[in-house]
Amino acid sequence: MKVLLLFIACILAFVACNKKKIFDGPDFYSDDFESYNSLEELLSNDDVNWSFTQLTSPENTIKPDTSIKHGGNKSMRFSSKKSDGKFVSKCSIAKQNMAFWEGETLRITAWYYLQGTQSAQWLFIMDMEEQVAIGAGPGMRLALVDNKICVEHKFYEDDLFQPQNGGIEMPRDQWVEIIWEVKLSQKNKGVVKVWQNGQLIIDASNTRTLPKDLLYSQQGTKGMVSSIEVGITANSRDNDLVMYVDDVLIQKIN
């Protein structure tokens, strides 16, 4: 029995040391959406473009748009029905099979245009997580609460909010640059920063930014981020919403 346990331990150690070799992927992607004339053109099975969409209502739509754009001649338009008690309304695109590992810093830059001034409590606009065999490993995502960007963890870690008396609301009916930078750590050595139009609105250090490896044997997580999702990743229960996204940049900075 001791020999068997030692053998298993050695195998697990070998796999852990070779994760990066086994689960390799790019750590850079950018898209200005200029080359697409339809949603179908945006998707590809070879990981050159985006990997998949989430459209959980038949009335939700994603399409290139030329009327409201940040740079160039096109952006992507996301139109979503509101969520309710029966289902979560999603209207988003995701880039999978990327590879950002513990100790690395991932930065996502994107321009957002949220149309209208209606309430959008707990509207989710950007996710980072790890794809696994079934579903996705728990990650983090940006949300609007009281019209202010916050960071929600989908694992056991406190969410990150702007100062209660000094937060900055997200402007509506105009382009807003959002930069989300995360140093990945399964321990309390991570860093989370969010900029809105060049102003630092969230700055947290000594925090956990990846789920612990306890989940690895249960769900297949490997201590990494491999999937980035933008758009209306989960709509509010308050209202139907329209959002435009342009000039997305996903990169490792160190």
Please place each PLM-identified region on the residue numbering.
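Bacterial Sec-dependent N-terminal signal peptides
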Residues: 1-24
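Low-complexity, Ser/Thr/Pro/Gly-rich disordered linker/stalk regions
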Residues: 17-177, 182-254
